[in-house]
Each structure stands twice: as C-alpha cells, then as structure tokens.
C-alpha cells in the first residue's frame, strides 16, 4: 500500500513537472505576444537598443536623449479594429439546435468571439474553455482563456490532434478553490486544503518545491505565484493509457466499459448470478486512452484527480494556433511592425525638423532702426495686426526681410506616403476595408469590389478563426446532446 502511494505521488510530481516544462517552452510565444500587444495598443517605443556606452535602453529613451520627442501614429490599432469590425458585421450563427442557440446567446459569444479574434490577430493564438460552472449551478459556460495562464505541449497539427498535455493556471478565493476541486461537501478535505494554503510555511514550501522542479527565473514566478491576494491552483489535463474491461451484460442486453480496477465488482455480481442461475456478465480486457484531470497546489499537493466527465471524453479547451508551419506561431500584426516603427521614426523626424527650422525670422538691418525705436518696439509692432514701422532706406539699400524655410522638403513626406502604402499592401487591410473612399468619383460597385478583394486577402485568417468557432460549437453539442 505504501509503495502504491509513493508511486502515485511520483507520477503526480512527474505530471506537474511536465506541465511546468510545457509552460517554459511557451515563454517565447508569451514574449512575442506581449511585444505585439504593446505595438497594437500604442506602446511602440519600448523595444530595447543600446546607448553609446553599450548599455541597454529603450528606443524611446534613446530618441529623447537626442533632444527629440518620440511620436506615435498608431496605424496597427486601426488595422485590427477594421478586421474585427468586418467580422462583427458578417457574423452568422446558423444554429438549428434550440439548446445550443440558447447557450450561445446566454454566453454572449458575439462579444467573446470578437475579443478572441482580436487576440488571434495579435498573438496568432486563441483559446476558449467550454465547461460547467460549478459556481453558477453547473450552467454551461464559455470563456476566453488568457494565453498568459495557458500551457500546452508543442503541437504540430493545426487541428491540435497531437495534444498530450494541456492546462490552465487559476487564481481563486479559498471558497472557489474548495468548490473547484470538489471538496464543498467534504469538511475534512476542505479543512486540509485550507491548512496547506493558509499556514506560515506556505511561501517556504512553494520555494522549496518549485526550486526542486527547476524554477529559477521570472517565468517560473508567474507559474507558481499569484499577483494578487488569491490562491494559485494548477489544472493539468493529460491523455493516458488505462486498463479497462469491456462488459456485456447478457441479462439486460447492455454493453459498457469500466476501469479494470472495478473487476471485483463484476466478479461479485457474477457469483450472485451463478447462485440464481442467471446469465452472467462477460468481460474482455482492453487498453484505451482517457483524458485525466489533476488539480495541484503550487506546493505540489494533488488536490483532485478524475477522468474527463464530459460526453466528448476530452479536455474542456478549444484552441487554434496560426499557422503552425513547423510548429511555429506567427500573428497577423507582426508582419507590419517594421513599417509601423518606420512611420513613427519619420513623423518624429518631420516634427523635429519643423520645430528646428526658421519660421518667420525677421532680418532687420542695424542701420535701418528708426530713431526713437528699440528692438523690442520693432518686435512688438511687427507681430501686431496693422502695425506700421517707419523706415528710411540707407545707402546700402538693405531692407527688412522675413525668412520662412520649407526645411521638410527633404523627401520625408514621400517616404511617409510610401511606408503607409506598404502598410496597406502587407496587411491586406486597404482603405476600402476601413470604410474610406479613395476617390469621390468611385462607384458603389467598384468600392464593394475593393472591399471583396481585401476580404479575400484576409480569407485565410477568417476561415481559420471560423474553424475554431465550429470546433467550439461541436464541443458544446457533444456536451448537451443526449447520450
């Protein structure tokens, strides 16, 4: 019995180690996503570079050190809003099942899917969770999952059929945690959970356990620790081989499958039937794959474990990664980051040149200063409306002259126009898709054709996301359909 407990503990730790490894392997994905998010929402001068001494510094700080103010013309945000807006204007949910329609409406999936598409454009990933909400009378609930709280093994299949381990990090109150792990009706288990989370050694236990599993960086901190006053729980789903018994009850003409560990129950039932001379239950040993869920504390405690309770027999997540060429994830917005940076540099340069150029400088010959006037008088009268300055030409013929220079005529505007045009070409989001008329003379048919052409350029993005929504609805149907 002791060896069995040790084996179970070793297996649980091995699974948690695999989950942590999957989390670490996604560190680059989270880093790139955070950079893409910063650019999309206007924080576009945070990329690191070096100063003249080789010290790391942000591009914005470096620009300020040269006396210029870094400016941002956020074209990426408008691009993303246009793509999401086009999606929302074309949403069509043709659902023939009344129960599914009610769930879709209750969960406000139009809003959820729009935000999921925005995440998909920014990070190349979108994840939703379809599950029963035990905090709301087991109502069927759909939620978007934050990529920063999600982990999965390295997958190559765009359908994610090669998923082997998947999970989510949760920050919960103590009451929520007790209900999530199925201890709400078990006072002893609830007290045990309260004890392991609320004692003076909790922080020390987290450090010791996470260090044993190799945690030694900031990414590790995000996995094991919360950023608020709640309690961290780690939900891990794995696909495992399991011994089963395929059973045929010849008395009731039913066919069912049970875990091999329940063989003694069948044996007892068959013994009773032999005495009554009734048909027995015939069995056949077999191996099958099952999805199993485990909940862990950050101190390594196994809080709960169970086989998938859903009719579809898998985990509750629906995910899509794009495009998964050689397993790589590349988002829609990352293609235009270089153009966005160049546009920002150009408008910063133009602003600096305009600020430093001569604007209305007055050249007034010293010998032409009228008698009784000071230079302050000349300055005041020159800037006043209808001002008059008496002036007597001298022998040199010099007259006052005001100078205004067009110092921006250095090709900067032309370069800016080129970059903005390239931005449209690379992204596929043209002016028509943004609702802008390129010419007043353009006809409605031509304008619609431009929109259709732009939509074709984005067709792969839209179709991939619609496949994700279809997978989500199929998972919903498999839960609510009768067995």
Regions found by a protein language model. Give the residues of each.
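Juxtamembrane/interface segments at transmembrane-helix termini
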Residues: 361-362
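Conserved short S/T/G-enriched processing/targeting/catalytic segments and their helical context
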Residues: 340
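Extended, helix-rich architectural segments
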Residues: 1-291, 295-298, 358, 411, ...
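His/Asp/Glu-rich acidic catalytic environments and adjacent acidic regulatory segments
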Residues: 336
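Long amphipathic alpha-helical segments
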Residues: 69-98, 128, 132, 151-154, ...
């Amino acid at each position: 019995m002791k060896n069995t407990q040790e084996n179970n503990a070793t297996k649980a730790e091995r699974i948690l180690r695999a989950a942590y490894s999957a989390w670490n392997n996604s560190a680059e994905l989270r880093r790139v996503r955070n950079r893409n998010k910063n650019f999309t929402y206007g924080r576009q001068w945070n990329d690191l570079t070096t100063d003249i001494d080789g010290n790391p510094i942000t591009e914005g700080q470096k620009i300020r050190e040269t006396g210029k103010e870094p400016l941002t013309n956020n074209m990426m945000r408008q691009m993303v809003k246009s793509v999401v807006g086009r999606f929302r204007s074309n949403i069509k949910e043709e659902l023939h099942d009344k129960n599914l329609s009610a769930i879709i409406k209750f969960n406000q999936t139009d809003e959820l899917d729009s935000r999921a598409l925005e995440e998909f454009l920014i990070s190349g990933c979108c994840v939703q969770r379809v599950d029963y909400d035990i905090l709301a009378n087991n109502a069927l609930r759909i939620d978007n999952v934050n990529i920063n709280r999600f982990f999965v093994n390295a997958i190559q299949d765009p359908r994610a059929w090669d998923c082997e381990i998947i999970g989510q990090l949760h920050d919960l109150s103590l009451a929520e945690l007790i209900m999530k792990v199925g201890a709400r009706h078990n006072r002893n288990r609830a007290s045990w959970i309260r004890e392991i989370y609320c004692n003076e050694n909790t922080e020390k236990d987290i450090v010791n356990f996470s260090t044993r599993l190799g945690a030694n960086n900031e990414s590790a901190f995000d996995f094991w620790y919360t950023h608020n006053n709640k309690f961290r729980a780690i939900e891990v789903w794995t696909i495992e081989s399991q011994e089963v018994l395929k059973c045929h009850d010849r008395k009731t003409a039913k066919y069912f499958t049970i875990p091999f560990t329940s063989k003694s129950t069948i044996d007892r039932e068959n013994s009773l039937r032999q005495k009554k001379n009734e048909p027995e239950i015939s069995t056949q040993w077999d191996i099958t794959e099952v999805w199993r869920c485990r909940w862990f504390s950050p101190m390594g405690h196994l809080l709960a474990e169970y086989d998938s309770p859903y009719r579809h027999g898998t985990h509750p997540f629906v995910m899509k990664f794009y495009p998964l060429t050689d397993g790589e994830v590349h988002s829609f917005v990352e293609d235009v980051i270089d153009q966005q940076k160049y546009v920002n540099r150009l408008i910063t340069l133009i602003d600096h040149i305009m600020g430093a150029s001569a604007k209305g400088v007055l050249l007034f010959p010293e010998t032409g200063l009228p008698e009784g006037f000071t230079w302050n008088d000349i300055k005041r009268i020159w800037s006043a409306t209808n001002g008059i300055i008496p002036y007597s030409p001298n022998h040199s013929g010099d007259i006052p002259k005001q100078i205004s220079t067009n110092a921006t005529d250095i090709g900067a505007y032309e370069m800016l126009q080129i970059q903005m045009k390239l931005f449209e070409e690379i992204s596929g989001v043209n002016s028509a898709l943004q609702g802008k008329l390129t010419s007043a003379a353009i006809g409605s048919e031509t304008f619609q054709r431009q929109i259709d052409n732009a939509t074709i350029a984005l067709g792969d993005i839209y179709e991939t996301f619609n496949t994700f929504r279809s997978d989500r609805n199929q998972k919903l149907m498999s839960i609510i359909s009768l067995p």
